[in-house]
């Protein structure tokens, strides 16, 4: 089975960094299987906040990403967010598709990612 974890991480980081409301204000990066996001405003001493967790396949017996609360959870669950917007979810789906992947919610905190077979 092909390791999809690097692609999942790349898509999540790219989507956050390219998302219009965040562009220039936040920077996403990977650290220890976590998608961390830092506020780039020099006035804040932001050490980064975990928005998503991308486990190894063996952890969940599926390639996936998880979000247990926080702003990452709100972005992928817009119908339950305080300030709902479907734009991030649409951008994420588009970026997964461009990477040859398909993402579907398993639950509000876990999204399964599979490779698209053509």
Could you tell me what each predicted segment is?
Residues 31, 105-118:
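Ser/Thr-rich, low-complexity intrinsically disordered terminal regions
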